[in-house]
A protein has these predicted regions:
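Generic detector of solvent-exposed, compositionally biased contiguous segments
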Residues: 6, 18-19
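Prokaryotic Sec-type signal peptides and long signal-anchor helices
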Residues: 6-8, 13, 239, 358
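Intrinsically disordered, low-complexity terminal segments enriched in Ser/Thr
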Residues: 13-18, 24-46
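Alpha/beta-hydrolase superfamily serine-hydrolase fold, recognizing
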Residues: 50-358
Length: 358
């Protein structure tokens, strides 16, 4: 197993205490969820799997590879998805001058974040755009403290010259959906509390231009970023201005029920009939905050059709902003988070240009 948390914030580990509430759903989810699940699609974020050591004789009640399985006694165990050296510590990156630190932003729920700041010489005396990031991982994996995030932000922060906030929302299945979405929305309210330079985080007070806020997410995180933009617009959030969103390789629902989503999201059909999984059926879509959206898809990604559909929904629907589509030929799901090839660099530059466009 691998840990999803950095040492200051050990909220979710690879094996958790018994998951009593979700086991109570077994009657409503019935036989189909009681069987080991073989997904009809590849993982939402991670491209490779390191098998678990099958040393336990415990009975598995629900199995959702490559993400997690739930034992009959309610314990949750996560699959080891890739080899890494554990969480990357916050601090100064000597190669880029990018600084980072970890903070708790919602003490009542334990939601934390990692904040990234470009080289001080590049931001002294002026305010920077704010990039709020929601990581991918099927709503049940990933963390701002993983090495993946460090590689991305030490490249993206100086390239776009932004202050970035990577939100550590609570994960399923221990925290059923839409907890991840609600945590992420509350994190944006926390950011808005810095309006006027009087918030709890000095880096934001000193360096953040809250009139230039951008949301970004990949895979499940892209779903969350969209949700946060819609929620901000529909509730009239004050204290900041969302200029745009970057929706990369988004996960949205399809025609067939997604059993893992159904397990983590009680009451959801797990299909495109659910507004949380399909923006086209969300009555609040016209109120989505932001002037522009960049939708990123990859040619070899099984989710590409859903990303294109999202682009078409914004382009042809009642939302009145500007939407762009970027298709990466020959690439797969979330390649820009794992690779540093020419196409990944081009996509990150496209994102930076999108943020800094006047």
């Amino acid at each position: 197993m691998f840990s999803f948390r950095s040492p200051p914030f050990p909220r979710n580990s690879h094996s958790s205490p018994p998951l009593k509430p979700l086991l109570c759903l077994s009657l409503s989810l019935s036989l189909s969820l009681s069987l080991a699940h073989t997904p009809a699609h590849p993982p939402l974020l991670f491209p490779s799997i390191v098998p678990m050591d099958p040393s336990s004789a415990d009975v598995v009640a629900h199995d959702f590879p490559p993400f997690f399985k739930v034992y009959k006694d309610g314990r949750v165990e996560r699959y080891k998805m890739f080899n890494n050296d554990g969480p990357s510590p916050a601090g100064d990156d000597p190669a880029t001058g990018v600084r980072s630190k970890d903070i708790v932003i919602l003490p009542d729920t334990g939601v934390s974040a990692r904040i990234w700041l470009p080289r001080i010489d590049d931001c002294r005396g002026r305010k920077l755009p704010v990039l709020v990031h929601y990581h991918g991982g099927g709503f049940c994996a990933g963390s701002p403290f993983d090495p993946i995030g460090q590689r991305f932000f030490t490249t993206m922060v100086p390239k776009a010259n932004v202050i970035a906030i990577d939100v550590d929302y609570r994960l399923g299945p221990e925290n059923p959906l839409p907890t991840a979405h609600e945590d992420s929305s509350e994190a944006l309210k926390w950011l808005a509390s810095h309006s006027g330079g009087h918030g709890p985080e000095p880096w934001i007070n000193e360096h953040a231009d809250l009139n230039r806020v951008f949301l970004i997410g990949e895979s499940a995180g892209a779903n969350i970023a969209h949700y946060v933009a819609v929620r901000a617009g529909s509730t009239g959030l004050t204290g900041l201005k969302i200029v745009g969103s970057i929706i990369a390789h988004p996960f949205f629902g399809g025609k067939e029920p997604d059993k893992m989503i159904m397990f983590m999201y009680p009451g959801s059909p797990g299909t495109d009939e659910d507004p949380l999984l399909n923006p086209a059926v969300d009555p609040d879509l016209p109120k989505m905050a932001g002037e522009r959206v960049l939708v990123c898809v990859a040619e070899n990604d099984w989710l590409m059709p859903r990303g294109v559909k999202y682009y078409e929904t914004l382009r042809d629907g009642p939302w009145k902003g500007e939407v762009e589509l970027d298709e990466a030929k020959g690439e797969d799901h979330c390649f820009h988070m794992f690779k540093r090839n020419e196409r990944a660099e081009q996509l990150l530059q496209r994102m930076a240009d999108f943020i800094n466009r006047e």
